[in-house]
């Protein structure tokens, strides 16, 4: 073992990363752009001890069953794991035939996602379909004592969080049933997410989305959290995840894939440090 001199240092609990493509992601540029399964060392060296695995664009050559198997394997290696049942598409893939049954009957399934909205890769489903799957997840969570949440992938579309407002408009489904993620991908979406969170909803930043220069519309996670807090968003309604091991496709103005990268999970640790050292949050608030 290695002994580390800890004088003057801070020891904190391992991070929970609620958005990790543990069996890989991508494929938007063809089969050669599929990212591989994640290795345990990529998770632990980023300070993460709990991961929530999920599928993304590809619900055809990747399966929820494989996701569950990978989650069990990682837990056997020493970390805690959970998964979402589903993918971008609607109807979304499951193990038992329904989101509700997956959540109730499979111990590791805590919700569904990531369901794509406001994105050219979504199924372009009507709001009624999104409302139905949110209700399925909620009831599944109630029956099993789980969160039963919907992880909602929000793209660059101009609708931003319009669907979330319509899903909850009649007041039956709580605004906290869905977790809109990637809210810092552009300034328009970020502003809409702040309004949504101030009205009682949640907002999830993606730490691996980072601006390349001053003209980039992407909002840096640590700076965005500071801005959201200053705008009056309660800390308890803000979260950060990495999108680790997922693909980072680059599209032109016509939606054509022109490049791809892989998201790093260690971005979570970097943004945590920046929250404390650059944005002035206390250690306890940054960990909340």
Q: Each predicted region: which residue ranges?
A:
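Long, well-ordered mid-to-C-terminal structural blocks that present hydrophobic/aromatic surfaces
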Residues: 204-234, 239
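His/Asp/Glu-enriched, well-ordered alpha-helical/loop segment
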Residues: 230-288
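Metal-associated gating/positioning segment near the N- to mid-region
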Residues: 6-69
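Residue-level marker for buried hydrophobic side chains located in beta-strands
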Residues: 14-16, 150, 240
């Amino acid at each position: 073992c290695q002994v580390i001199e800890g004088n003057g240092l801070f020891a904190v609990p391992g991070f929970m990363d609620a958005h990790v493509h543990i069996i890989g992601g991508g494929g938007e540029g063809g089969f050669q752009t599929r990212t591989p399964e994640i290795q345990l060392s990529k998770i632990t060296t980023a300070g993460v001890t709990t991961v929530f695995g999920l599928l993304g664009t590809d619900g055809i050559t990747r399966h929820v069953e494989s996701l569950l198997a990978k989650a069990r394997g990682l837990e056997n290696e020493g970390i805690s794991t959970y998964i979402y049942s589903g993918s971008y598409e609607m109807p979304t893939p499951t193990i038992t035939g329904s989101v509700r049954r997956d959540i109730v009957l499979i111990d590791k399934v805590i919700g569904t996602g990531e369901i794509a909205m406001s994105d050219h890769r979504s199924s372009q489903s009507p709001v009624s379909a999104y409302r139905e799957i949110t209700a399925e997840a909620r009831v599944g969570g109630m029956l099993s004592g789980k969160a039963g949440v919907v992880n909602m992938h929000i793209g660059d579309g101009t609708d931003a969080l319009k669907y979330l407002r319509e899903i909850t408009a009649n007041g039956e489904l709580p605004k906290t049933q869905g977790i809109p993620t990637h809210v810092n991908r552009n300034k328009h979406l970020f502003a809409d997410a702040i309004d949504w969170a101030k009205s009682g909803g949640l907002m999830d930043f993606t730490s691996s989305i980072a601006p390349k220069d001053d003209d980039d519309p992407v909002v840096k996670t640590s700076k965005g959290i500071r801005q959201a807090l200053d705008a009056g968003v309660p800390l308890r309604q803000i979260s950060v995840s990495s999108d680790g091991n997922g693909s980072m496709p680059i599209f032109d103005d016509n939606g054509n894939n022109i490049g791809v990268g892989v998201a790093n999970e260690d971005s979570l640790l970097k943004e945590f440090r920046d929250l404390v050292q650059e944005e002035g949050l206390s250690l306890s608030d940054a960990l909340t």
